[in-house]
Amino acid sequence: MSKATPRRRRWRIGELAEATGVTVRTLHHYEHTGLLAASERTDGGHRMYDRESVQRVHQIRALRELGFSLHEIRKAMEGTTSLIDLLRKHLERIELQVARATLLRDRLRDMTTGSEIQVSVDELPATLDAMSKVQTRSQTSRCTCKLAIEREERWRRIRDELRDCMDRGEHPCGERAKAVAVAARLLISEIAGADSRVSTILKVLARLSAPRSLAGWDP
């Protein structure tokens, strides 16, 4: 005598919401955007969902927590965009946001640190305007982020080359050491642009710390 095939587990929409940690309203929105579909309906018209639906909602939640839009998630799930491409593009956006936040942080530090600095209400409009310009540039120019990554890699190579010179005991006036110094100065000038404060800060650090305590850099 053969055994009856057990019926697969089904979830009503409220049960699915409870099982996945989202609201019923959110599930309705997922359905409206084409991300989720009921596996079947009861005779009374109630939506029913299967185990694949539960897994799909968990996948949507995971991608949402990474910051993806529902439109991007749908493209990835439909296969029109590969997940790795989606992750790379999102990484670029995150790096831009980090760069923007770093610039804003430095600006705020300039305004709030130091006993001689006094921040007045009159300065705030100009400060907010500067922040807005930084935000606009970050949002509209991805090449800025790529350039920053490329410069950071160049900086690491210069640092490693200099440390190798020091470990080998090469003379500071040797050809290799001079080439590293030239590369470092060129990169610093490229990063600083017309901002003379960078070279000023390096000179101050040179007076305050010995070269080796500056991770091998001797301005």
UniProtKB/Swiss-Prot annotation:
Xref: PROSITE patterns: HTH_MERR_1 (PS00552), HTH_MERR_2 (PS50937)
GO BP: any one term: nitrogen fixation
Domain spans labelled HTH merR-type: 10-79
Record-annotated disulphide pairs: none
A GO molecular-function descriptor: DNA binding
Record's keyword terms, sorted: DNA-binding, Nitrogen fixation, Nodulation
DNA-binding region coordinates: 13-32
Keyword presence, DNA-binding: yes
Source domain of life: Bacteria
PANTHER family hit by this protein: HTH-TYPE TRANSCRIPTIONAL ACTIVATOR MTA, REDOX-CYCLING DRUG-SENSING TRANSCRIPTIONAL ACTIVATOR SOXR
Functional summary from the UniProt entry: Involved in genotype-specific nodulation of soybeans.
Protein name: Nodulation protein NolA
